[in-house]
Amino acid sequence: MQQYSSKYNKQAILLVNLGTPDNYDTKSIKRYLKEFLSDPRVIEANPILWKIILNLIILPIRAKKNIHTYKTVWNKQHNKSPLLFYTENLADKLDKKLDNYIVDYAMRYGNPSIESKIKSLQDQGATEIIIFPLYPQYSATTATVYDEVYRVLSKLRWQPTIKGINPYYDNKFHIQTISQQIKEHLKKLDSTPDTVLFSFHGLPKEYFDKGDPYYCHCYKTYRLVKEELQNEYPNIDFELSFQSRFGPKKWLEPYTTVKLEEFAKQNKSVVIIAPGFSADCLETLEELAISEKENFIKKGGKEFSLIPCLNDSNQHVDMLYNIIDEEICLKK
């Protein structure tokens, strides 16, 4: 990130993504998963019982299991996970576009931490920090970003002003960007697919029952993009699903795996997009692009094509710029 004189640059924008291990070894993965899965916003369970299950069962098994999956998607050229690589580049591009603001990024879990970046921004003279969670749909992962921000602030004698960017699941710039992304992908294909499947990260159904708006936000994103596209593509079915189920509880349905198996049995061709993810990560590059694709083809599916996340594309930079400008009226 660029360094700025504290005399002239007092406002900062902090992009926050979910997080990633520092490397794909057992120790790094276990450390990351422990921080992530210890957050009561993420796992709502008896804290004592969950701590025992997490440390004795979940972490030893999942850390070893995930070595191969992380290694498969790891950006070995830069020795970074794709999520970290794209988020870092995204922040750098937005920083260059916003001359009057300091732009940086942090991860809610893992490194670079929110705490380290708030300190860095203060050292550069930021007296106002705009927090921008890169999750279009609001859920526990959004709330916990602010939990951590205010935990950090509670320890500071000098606290910067904090502002937050709202979830952008139905923002016109977001809907237009996702719609255009799908159009551009469809133009590259040799034939028109039978279905475009919108796959969002899943959530235990009980969270929805308790009032979490995530499902409603996902559905609205899906509906608004569908409305943008269905007149132009009347022969394509647009459908919604949820992936990455974890544990024995019932999660939001329909499950992506189940929907893809249904399409495979019907020998359909499918294009899949994961608009809840701002950058490609394990859930898109391994779970969807490899595991789900292999299962889909094995079960009789015709063609499978995954649309990349917005990542560090210029379209993503422009979209974030417009959303921020709409929310806070950027200084030009």
Swiss-Prot record:
GO cellular component, one term: cytoplasm
Protein name: Ferrochelatase
Reactions listed under catalytic activity: heme b + 2 H(+) = protoporphyrin IX + Fe(2+)
Functional summary from the UniProt entry: Catalyzes the ferrous insertion into protoporphyrin IX.
UniProt xrefs under Gene3D superfamilies: 3.40.50.1400
Binding site for Fe cation: H201, E283
Xref: SUPFAM superfamilies: Chelatase (SSF53800)
GO MF annotation, one: ferrochelatase activity
Family: Belongs to the ferrochelatase family.
Subcellular location, record wording: Cytoplasm
Pathway(s) per entry: Porphyrin-containing compound metabolism; protoheme biosynthesis; protoheme from protoporphyrin-IX: step 1/1
Leading EC class: lyase
Gene Ontology annotations of biological process type: heme biosynthetic process
EC number annotated for this UniProt entry: 4.98.1.1
PROSITE patterns xrefs: FERROCHELATASE (PS00534)
Primary localization class, coarse: cytoplasm
Keywords: Cytoplasm, Heme biosynthesis, Iron, Lyase, Metal-binding, Porphyrin biosynthesis
Matching Pfam families: Ferrochelatase (PF00762)
